[in-house]
């Protein structure tokens, strides 16, 4: 076990799991994000959820604020989220990091708020920015796998422009449920909970958890979305009269 010291406290790293590496690439045929693991290409969890979600709310929001403003907000939020994740990743690894850009100055206090409140119960961590996959089905990258209040946990960090309501984050729950299933299948673990840590630019912190029966229910809901995704892909191939490749069935 290695021990790191950062921001006034130590975080232990455990080598309990030997994680398989994967490469994230863009599939040129579909233009979607896929993971290349053990010579297989798997759709990402975010691609699956994005392709099967109800787009009506997004359409209404774009109509309200305008296409250009919607793109500006989306790009700014994405950049801020990327920077916040970098701060958190380096904190967990125990390595120094700073971002002196205006985006970085927004993201840094948000990351510190998550460190101060969200990561306080973390006793040890197994992996940061871990590529996980369920062979033949899907893959993705989770922000943190750790021991949180005595439970093996999948953690996802999220930035948000405003506080979240439970009913707005169903895809977040399905995301951590998908990662938990993949981790358990490949590594023989028993992930007990998923924790979503959210912070806004005005430093409002929220935490959402799924464990036990609730986590199982989110797993089932993700599997339904996975079925929908494959149905959509099959329909697209039939319409295009594309012959399915052998690897589609692996």
Feature locations, PLM:
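Charged phosphate-binding loop/patch that engages nucleotide di/tri-phosphates or the phosphate backbone
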Residues: 221-250
